[in-house]
Amino acid sequence: SKVAELANAVVSNADQKDLLRMSWGVLSVDMEGTGLMLMANLFKTSPSAKGKFARLGDVSAGKDNSKLRGHSITLMYALQNFVDALDDVERLKCVVEKFAVNHINRQISADEFGEIVGPLRQTLKARMGNYFDEDTVSAWASLVAVVQASL
């Protein structure tokens, strides 16, 4: 399957895994803050995405919106699961497919899900400072592609 193929490509790329783990080390210092930043960047970059999150209420309220906070935290733990599974194709497929189900249920297409790469790039840049580089963005984009293949 396409999912297995892409998951295998990520798991077998030592350089990308190093970049993912190193950058995750930075992103995960403040799980909630990073999750909220990523969501805010998504809504800025892709205003149409706001409509997909109508159930969360006023997303411009940021941290004051408990539903948005909850989603941001859950999102970060999903990323943690992906990073923890980088050495095991079957495990990576399992956690990605579980994550994908939530998005399939909300009718998020693979293309729509792919819109997260730009906001993720902005978030990485803000969090990593001088350590930021495009190879790190590419590594995360490879992981996003595994999710897209599951949608």
From Swiss-Prot:
One of its GO terms (molecular function) is heme binding. It comes from the Eukaryota. The modification N-acetylserine is found at S1. Gene3D superfamilies: Globins (1.10.490.10). Heme b binds at H103. Residues 11-151 form the Globin domain. CDD domains: Mb-like. Keywords: Acetylation, Heme, Iron, Metal-binding, Oxygen transport, Transport. Heterotetramer of two alpha chains and two beta chains. Belongs to the globin family. PANTHER family: BLR2807 PROTEIN, GEO09476P1. This is Globin-2 B chain. It comes from Anadara inaequivalvis. The lineage of its organism: Eukaryota, Metazoa, Spiralia, Lophotrochozoa, Mollusca.
